Regions:
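Conserved N-terminal alpha-helix of the aminotransferase class I/II PLP-enzyme fold
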Residues: 1-10
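Short acidic capping loops at alpha-helix termini that bridge into adjacent secondary structure
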Residues: 2-3, 25-28, 171-172
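Buried hydrophobic packing segments
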Residues: 13-18, 39, 160
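PLP-dependent aminotransferase-like
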Residues: 19-99, 103-115, 119-124, 131
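Conserved active-site segment immediately N-terminal to the catalytic lysine
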Residues: 122-156
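Conserved core segment of the aminotransferase class I/II
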Residues: 150-178
């Protein structure tokens, strides 16, 4: 990544990644139920609402096909943003987590997020060193979160990191840390 900024832990990295991506109070964020609680907690800390979609059998990560189906049935684009038709809440981000280092179908998520005007925030806490089609995980969205907790691939006993190739995001990250 062009920039990497350390923070206190992976939950904090997810929280700040969501904040940088424009998630606000009352928004909905799509993620997966098969994950560490930090993913849903980071969404909740912003007073946003986690929406759970199913995982793929082959990756054990969030299924872009299940997300697409859910969006087609429950969402609409209004004024350049995605909204839940039944709750009227803005759907501002999708957070796939690369379970046990198995990358989700990232090319599908990139297309889906562009089409539905939703930010892609990768939870790459379990996939440091993993590749998807020759590219490291954590580099497909504008921002990604890593964790160095004791049960992760690389550990410092704790700590997290935000990575981004987007210069606007990476410059803004420092403002949140300071």
């Amino acid at each position: 990544a062009a920039r990497a900024v350390v923070c206190v832990n992976g939950t904090n990295a997810l929280y700040m990644s969501l904040l940088l991506s424009g998630v606000e109070k009352g928004d909905e964020v799509i993620t997966q139920p098969l994950t560490f609680i930090a993913t849903a907690n980071a969404i909740s800390y912003l007073n946003a609402v986690p929406v759970f979609c199913d995982v793929d059998e082959d990756t054990m990560g969030l299924s872009p096909f299940a997300v697409r189906k859910w969006l087609e049935e429950n969402a609409e684009i209004k004024n350049g943003a995605c909204y839940n038709k039944s709750t009227s809440r803005k759907i501002s981000a999708v957070v796939p987590m690369h379970t046990f280092g198995h990358p989700v179908h990232l090319d599908e998520f990139v297309k889906l997020c562009e089409e539905w005007k939703i930010a892609l925030v990768e939870d790459a806490a379990e996939s440091i060193g993993s590749f998807y089609k020759g590219k490291h995980t954590g580099l497909f969205g504008k921002v990604a979160a890593l964790s160095f907790n004791g049960n992760k691939i690389i550990t410092t006993g704790g700590g997290g990191m935000i990575v981004s190739n987007n210069l606007f995001f990476s410059n803004k990250i420092h403002l949140f840390i300071l």
